[in-house]
Amino acid sequence: MLCQFLMKKTILVSSCLLGCKVRYDKTSKPLPKEQLIALEEKFNLVGVCPEVLGGLPCPRQPAEISRDREVLTQSGQVLSTFFLKGAHKALNICKNYGIQLAVLKSKSPSCGFGKIYDGTFSGCLINGNGITSDLLLKNGVKVINESELDAWLKTVKE
């Protein structure tokens, strides 16, 4: 078993995609079973929720990133410190495990990659990345979201 673990690369995965109820509304958004099995066959998975790592509870108020990159709740509470703390903890996990790829939850103010909510709580999406995705990318960790997973898995060598 240890030998098998050592032979596989390790990747970071948003905990909510693994079925953990860590989202702001205390739900999960699990990957389809087939995708999860394919990931587990090829990789060691390390689940993280940067928001929880940063000290936020479940449930919590939804948050979005404002134009000036502050993370705010709809009531105006500033959560940037929690998000940054969680992002740095996720980066440290990547460094400690030699992780070079993260599969993160789309649209999230922490994990979103490519598209995030615009900060107005209107449901509108804009181009951009979440706090954790940005930090990982700046430190050489490749980031994809769950909608890109099938295409990416096809490129992975056995």
Language-model region placement:
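Short amphipathic alpha-helices and their capping/turn segments at secondary-structure boundaries
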Residues: 2-6, 31-45, 86-101
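Divalent-metal-activated hydrolytic enzyme cores
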Residues: 4-6, 53, 61-89, 93, ...
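Extreme N-terminal starter segment of soluble prokaryotic enzymes
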Residues: 7-11
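Short, surface-exposed acidic-centric catalytic microdomains
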Residues: 29-73
